[in-house]
Amino acid sequence: MREVLLSECIDLLYESHFVISKPFGRSCFDLIAKKADLRFLIKILKNIDSLSTEQSEELLNIAKMLQAVPIIIGTRTRNSVMEEGAVYERYGIKAVTFNTFRDQLFGEPPVVYANRGGFFVNIDGAVLRETREKLKISVGELAEISRVSRKTIYKYEQNEANPSAEVAIKIEEYLDVPLIKGINIVDYMEGLKSQKSREEAFEKILKESEDFKIRVIDILGDMGFNLLETTKAPFDAVAEESKEDDSENQNIIFTNIQETENEEIRRKAMIVDEISKMLNSHSLLVLEKKTNENKRITSMSISELEKIGDTVDLLEFIEKKKKSTK
C-alpha cells in the first residue's frame, strides 16, 4: 500500500511539473519536490501515527533550513481511515490523504481540520461580526440557532476559537454569507509555526554523535557555518553559511561524514549530490582518509578540511571540484 501511494505521489508531482528526487529509504522524508519557489519534504505513511518524535523533529529542522514545506501523506490514523478533504496534524506537521494533496495542488484547498472532538473549520471572525451587526442580530440569537454559548460566539468573532463544520454551516445559512476559509497546506511559515529552534535540536543530537562526526561538525562550526546534524536523513549534516538573502540555497552544503568509504557510502553520497543539484546548493563527503577518487562526488579528508580557513574558502573549494569534473 505504501509503495502504491509513493508511486502515485511521484506521478502527481511530475504531472504538476515538479522536479523531484529519487525516493529515499529509512529517512525522515521520502521525497523532495521543487517547483519555482515551492519546496516539499514529503513523508509517505500508511498510518500517520507511526511517525516518531525523532523523525518529526528532524523533518521540521531540515524543512526550516531548506525553506521547504514538510507534509505527511497517508491513508489512516491509529483508530480510523483518514477523511478526504480534511487536514490532520502530527507533531506540528500537516497530514492529508493523497486526494486532498492533489486537490490542493490543483487549486482547491481543504477547509476542514481534525482536532480533539471532531472536525473544525477556520472562519472569518471580522466578517461574522460585521454581518451580524449589519443584520441587527444579537449574539444571543445567533448563539441559540447555532446551539453554542454567547461566549463562544464572541470567541468566533475575535478569531479566538473555531466552530465545528456543522456549526459553521448553520451560521453561514442563517446569515447568508460565506465565512469558512480554506486551509493552505503549502504555506511555508504556517507549516513551521510549531518548529523548535535548530540550536536545541542540534545540541540534543550532538550528544549522541560518534567522535569522528563530532570532529567534523566542530570544524565546520568553527568556520562559521550554521549547522543541523541529522540521523534520519540520507545526509549526516546540513551546513549553512549565514547570509542576508534567503531567496536561494546557494550557500547550503549537504554533508555526509564517514570514517571509511565503501559502496554504500558512495551510493548515498551520489543521492545527496542529486538533492543538492535540485536545490541549487552543494554536497560534500568528508572522510578520515580519501581512497579512490570518484568524479561524481565532491569529497575531502578531514585533514584537508582542517586546512580550510572559513566558509568562503570551503565553498570555493567545492566549486572548483565541481568545475573540474565537468
Swiss-Prot record:
Under the heading Gene3D superfamilies, the entry gives: lambda repressor-like DNA-binding domains (1.10.260.40)
Which residues does UniProt assign to DNA binding?
Answer: 139-158
Query: Key word DNA-binding present in the record?
Result: yes
One molecular function GO term is: DNA-binding transcription factor activity
The coiled-coil regions, if any, are none
Q: Which Pfam families match?
A: HTH_3 (PF01381)
Q: Does the keyword Transcription apply?
A: yes
Boundaries of every HTH cro/C1-type domain copy: 128-183
What's the domain of life for this entry?
Answer: Archaea
What InterPro entries does this protein's entry cite? Arc_TR_HTH, Cro/C1-type_HTH, Lambda_DNA-bd_dom_sf
| SMART domains in UniProt | HTH_XRE (SM00530)
Keywords linked to the UniProt accession: DNA-binding, Transcription, Transcription regulation
**Range of residues in the leader sequence:** none
List the HAMAP family hit by this protein, alphabetically.
HTH_type_cro_C1
Please give the name of this protein.
Answer: Putative HTH-type transcriptional regulatory protein MmarC5_0898
- What species does this protein belong to? Methanococcus maripaludis (strain C5 / ATCC BAA-1333)
Upper lineage: Archaea, Methanobacteriati, Methanobacteriota, Methanomada group, Methanococci
